[in-house]
Amino acid sequence: MRFLVFGASGMAGHMIALYLKEQGHSVVGFSRKKVSFLDKQVNGDAQDKTLIRETIEEGNFDVVINAIGILNTFAEKSPEAAAYLNGEFPHMLARLVLVEDMPTRVFHMSTDCVFAGNTGPYTEKSIPDGQSVYDRTKAAGELRDGKSITFRNSIVGPDINPNGVGLLNWFMAQTGPIGGYTHAMWTGLTTLELAKAMESAAHEQASGLVNMVPEGNISKYELLGLFNKELRNNSVEIYKDDSVDLDKTLVRTNFDLPFRPSSYPKQIADLACWIQDHKQLYPHYTLG
């Protein structure tokens, strides 16, 4: 199959693009920065609507994957950019393939942060109530048309950027001791598991919004413990921190897609194997 991945140099995008390539698919990456692992790349900016339209119209893609977004702190500092990239951009992609009557579908990434975390758990029918610029712009960007798929979940994964702000990147730079929130509950996927979910979905005809998460949740303390076990040989001291009480647990009720995510321990174990096999991409990580 032919895939176009927007944000191919980012935390999620690089994993998705490289995984799909290694599965034998034709993958074109779209990003501002060149990446070493893709032969086919378009270097451009998400603001360049002409380049985006031409790339999609000429590419004959089966799926366009949107892994572009402005994260929390940056969204607060640049609300207009967040409104466009998080909220408007995914709808622009969806409209483009609909108006041009292309067979191409759009896969979009959303987040548990569309919810405030005060009244969890949340299903696909729950009304987003997040209050920050990031929360609201990500909620605005969710696609619910009859052709696109929105994958809603939190994500963790490696970053080829040593200055990336993701949880795993942060953890890999720690020597300890560090605190892990025991009352902050998490549901999500590794970026590797998300890539697998997207590859599976590309072969299906379903559409709409899916809380793509395993059954059940874990605390951030438990999640850090899995990182510690699989990536640092339990070398980092992690203490329990009960100062944060937050439950953004997602519950999946839409099973139109057959893919079922692996358990959290297996996801992190699989991710550790991936990082070890691709350690040239992550020289800033010291593996235990």
Predicted regions and their residues:
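NAD(P)H-binding glycine-rich loop region in Rossmannoid oxidoreductase-like domains
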Residues: G44-G87
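N-terminal Rossmann NAD(P)H-binding glycine-rich loop of SDR-like oxidoreductase domains
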Residues: M1-Q23
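Amphipathic terminal alpha-helices
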Residues: S263-G288
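NAD(P)-dependent short-chain dehydrogenase/reductase
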Residues: G120, Q131, L143-G188, L192-E193
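Conserved Rossmann-fold NAD(P)-dependent oxidoreductase catalytic core, especially the SDR/UDP-sugar
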Residues: H91-D129
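Adenosine-cofactor binding site in Rossmann-like domains, unifying the SAM/SAH pocket
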Residues: G29-I52
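Glycine-rich NAD(P)-binding loop of the Rossmann-fold in SDR/ketoreductase-type enzymes
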Residues: K77, A81-M92, K125-P128, S132, ...
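Mid/C-terminal beta-alpha module of Rossmann-like enzyme folds, strongest
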Residues: A195-D247, Q280-G288
